């Protein structure tokens, strides 16, 4: 009987659905109670109700109360053939571009998120520490002009002309260094070099001049103003006469204490003053500076104070201003002036300014006028004047502003 009832109920449910003929629709209505009737040929009809229990509640979403309908974002994507289609995931190329933008444009936000995360193990902290220098190395620091100049002067060494390296090392002036190269007295890495234009690096190349090796690190450039006394020459050829460079012996002897590990500069005078002339002479180890200052094209005015024997008349001043022949060239002074008399100086004095600076030029001008020179002193070169408190045989290091007054632009 139970089997008959079950089969009858099933057939009844099927016939019930067929009778109702529910249309296919996306909307379904819940049925709470169903009235059923079962009958057979041997018994009377039996009616009963079928109740449906309500569905169990679905578990809450793990996205903080957000329903799946809210999480679904439709994407309309155009395919390769040009048709539009609807998909639930964003295109792959969009995800790739967003990842690149987040990495390149927002590095600070990325770093903040990393800082919030606690370090789990020592290995992770080591990884973070090791990766931080790489991120800093990608950004090049901006250096000021002063910092770049300091680096170029003290650390950066680029190949230079061989003649310029010799002049910077204090071997000789640029022109004299070129003559040494042409004469075959310079070797580079054991090979004789006859071209001054050869590019060398003193820190890497082995350079010899007359059997003496040029140090790898060039000495710093120094500049001095010397008040040369009488009896000193500006060259080193005559051993029986003292050289003006010997006045720097004390300075050079204490060089190693003041500059440990730095080679001593080889000093030489810029231009010359004869043995009987006193006053301003520039001493340096910079060959470029010496060539610029002593070259005739610089046309730097040089002022001399000369004391003469006897009285000076107008005709003497006229004769000096007209000039005279010196070394085959007619030299004319820039100015000639009779200085006022002083009680402590009985002799007459002249202020003479020249710009050519030829050998014995001022003495020849005074001699040509019929006067005898008693003493001669140079007091000015260009815009730099010999300090009044600088005693004979003493020297003072020149400042950058004083070098500019001498016409030097480094």
Swiss-Prot record:
Per the record, the GO terms for biological process are: maturation of LSU-rRNA from tetracistronic rRNA transcript (SSU-rRNA, LSU-rRNA, 4.5S-rRNA, 5S-rRNA); maturation of SSU-rRNA from tetracistronic rRNA transcript (SSU-rRNA, LSU-rRNA, 4.5S-rRNA, 5S-rRNA); plastid translation; pseudouridine synthesis
A GO MF annotation of the entry reads:
mRNA binding
Q: Where is the S4 RNA-binding domain?
A: 160-229
The entry's cellular-component GO terms read: amyloplast; chloroplast
Q: Where do the catalytic residues lie?
A: 274 (nucleophile)
Claim: Protease is one of the keywords in the record: no
* Location(s) in or outside the cell: Plastid, Chloroplast
Which UniProt key words apply to this protein?
A: Chloroplast, Isomerase, Plastid, RNA-binding, rRNA processing, Transit peptide
Q: Any idea what this protein is called?
A: Putative ribosomal large subunit pseudouridine synthase SVR1, chloroplastic
Species name:
Arabidopsis thaliana
């Amino acid at each position: 009987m139970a089997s008959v009832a079950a089969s009858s109920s099933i057939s009844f449910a099927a016939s019930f659905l067929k009778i109702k003929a529910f249309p296919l629709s996306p909307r379904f209505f819940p049925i709470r109670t169903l009235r059923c009737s079962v009958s057979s040929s041997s018994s009377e009809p039996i009616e009963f109700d079928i109740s449906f229990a309500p569905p169990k509640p679905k578990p809450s979403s793990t996205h903080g109360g957000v329903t799946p309908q809210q999480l679904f974002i439709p994407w309309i994507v155009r395919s390769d053939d040009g048709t539009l289609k609807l998909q639930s995931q964003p295109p792959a190329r969009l995800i790739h571009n967003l990842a690149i933008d987040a990495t390149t444009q927002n590095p600070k936000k990325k770093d903040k998120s990393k800082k919030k995360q606690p370090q789990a193990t020592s290995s992770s902290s080591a990884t973070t520490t090791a990766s931080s220098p790489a991120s800093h190395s990608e950004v090049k620091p901006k250096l000021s002009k002063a910092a770049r100049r300091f680096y170029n002067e003290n650390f950066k060494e680029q190949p230079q002309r061989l003649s310029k390296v010799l002049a910077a090392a204090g071997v000789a002036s640029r022109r004299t260094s070129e003559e040494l190269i042409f004469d075959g007295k310079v070797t580079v890495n054991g090979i004789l070099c006859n071209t001054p234009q050869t590019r060398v690096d003193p820190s890497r190349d082995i350079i010899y001049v007359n059997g003496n090796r040029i140090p790898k690190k060039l000495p710093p450039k120094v500049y001095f103003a010397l008040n040369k006394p009488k009896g000193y020459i500006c060259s080193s050829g005559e051993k029986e006469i003292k050289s003006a460079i010997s006045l720097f012996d004390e300075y050079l002897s204490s060089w190693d204490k003041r500059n440990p590990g730095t080679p001593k500069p080889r000093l030489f005078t810029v231009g010359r003053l004869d043995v009987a002339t006193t006053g301003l002479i520039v001493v340096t180890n910079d060959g470029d500076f010496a060539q610029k200052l002593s070259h005739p094209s610089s046309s730097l005015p040089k002022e001399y104070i000369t004391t003469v024997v006897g009285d000076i008349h107008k005709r003497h001043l006229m004769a000096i201003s007209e000039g005279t022949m010196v070394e085959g060239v007619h030299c004319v002074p820039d100015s000639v002036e009779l200085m006022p008399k002083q009680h402590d100086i009985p002799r007459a004095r002249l202020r003479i300014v020249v710009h050519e600076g030829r050998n014995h030029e001022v003495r020849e001008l005074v001699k040509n006028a019929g006067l005898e020179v008693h003493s001669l002193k140079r007091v000015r070169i260009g815009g730099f004047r010999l300090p009044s408190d600088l005693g004979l045989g003493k020297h003072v290091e020149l400042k950058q502003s004083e070098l500019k007054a001498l016409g030097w632009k480094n």
